[in-house]
Design a protein with these regions (language model features):
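Acidic, histidine-bearing metal-coordination/catalytic regions of metal-dependent phosphoesterases
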Residues: 1-148, 154-241, 246-250
C-alpha cells in the first residue's frame, strides 16, 4: 500500500531553521532554510552514519510502499526551566571563564547559563502547537498515534518545572513564574545587575550586549513569566527519564 503525506502538515521536509549571518560580536538571528530529504534507516546492514551513532544501520531513500504501523512525534531535551529558582547556579560560570558570560561558538563547555532560558515554556508550547498542526506523519500520512519525550523534560528536577511541562503537553493554563509576582527575579533582572548576564530591558552595559551584539528587548522578562493557555499536543505522550529530571541542573 502506498500512503501519501498530508500536504498541509508542516515539517522539516518543507523548511528548517538555520543560523543567519554572524554579527561582529558573534550574535546571530535565526532564519529559514531549505527542507531536509527523507531518509530511511534500517537494521539489516552494517555501516557508519553521520552523527554520534554507528553500527548496523543503513540509509536509503524511502519509496513510499508498505503499510505504516505507527506514527510518533518525537520531542527531546525540552529542559523546561524555572530560571528564578534559588537553586540555579549560574554564578559558577565565573569560575570557569571569569570574563566571558556565554557558551563558546563551538559548543557546550559546561556552562550553567544561557540567555534564552526564560523562554523555555513558550518554546515548548510552540513545539506542541506545531505537532498538533501536523496531525500526520510527513511521509506516510498516517495520523499521529502518540508523542515520546526522550529525557530531560525539566532542567533542574523541580516539581513546578514538571507541572509546567505537563500543562503544556496536555493543554491548559500555564503560569511560568515562581518569584515575586511584581517583578522578574532571575539573573537578567535590572535590580541585581551583573554584567555577566544579558539584560534585555537595558540598564548598564553587559557582556552579551557590549561584546557579543545581543539586542535590547524591553519587556521580554515580564512577558516570559506571563500566564498563557497551552493548546496541548492533542495526543497521548510518554516520557523517558533524563539526568536533569533527577539532579539539580543535571
Amino acid at each position: 500500500m502506498t500512503v501519501r503525506p498530508d500536504p498541509r502538515s508542516p515539517s522539516t521536509r518543507d523548511r528548517t531553521l538555520r543560523g543567519g549571518s554572524i554579527g561582529p560580536g558573534g550574535y546571530r538571528r535565526l532564519t529559514t532554510g531549505a527542507g531536509e530529504p527523507w531518509i530511511v534507516r534500517t537494521l539489516d546492514e552494517t555501516g557508519p552514519i553521520s552523527g554520534h551513532i554507528s553500527g548496523p544501520i543503513r540509509q536509503e531513500r524511502a519509496v513510499g510502499d508498505g503499510e505504516p504501523l505507527l506514527a510518533i512525534a518525537h520531542l527531546s531535551d525540552t529542559h523546561v526551566m524555572d530560571c528564578q529558582s534559588p537553586a540555579r547556579v549560574e554564578f559558577l560560570d565565573r569560575f570557569l571563564h571569569p570574563d566571558v558570560a556565554l557558551p563558546s561558538a563551538t559548543g557546550d563547555d559546561g556552562r550553567t547559563y544561557r540567555p534564552q532560558e526564560p523562554l523555555t515554556t513558550q518554546v515548548l508550547d510552540a513545539m506542541a502547537r506545531s505537532i498538533a498542526a501536523a496531525r500526520t506523519g510527513p511521509f506516510t500520512g498516517r495520523p499521529l498515534d502518540l508523542s515520546i519525550v526522550t529525557g530531560d523534560l525539566t532542567d533542574s528536577a523541580q516539581a513546578n518545572e514538571l507541572a509546567w511541562l505537563a500543562a503544556i503537553l496536555d493543554g491548559g493554563r500555564v503560569h511560568p513564574d515562581s518569584g515575586d509576582p511584581g517583578r522578574f527575579e532571575g539573573v537578567g533582572c535590572l535590580a541585581w545587575h551583573d554584567p555577566a548576564y544579558w539584560h534585555p530591558d537595558g540598564g548598564p552595559g553587559d557582556i552579551a550586549r557590549d561584546r557579543h551584539g545581543f539586542p535590547l528587548a524591553p519587556g521580554l522578562l515580564d512577558a516570559a513569566r506571563r500566564p498563557f493557555t497551552a493548546a496541548g499536543l492533542g495526543l497521548p505522550w510518554l516520557a523517558v527519564y533524563g539526568n536533569h529530571d533527577g539532579l539539580v541542573q543535571g
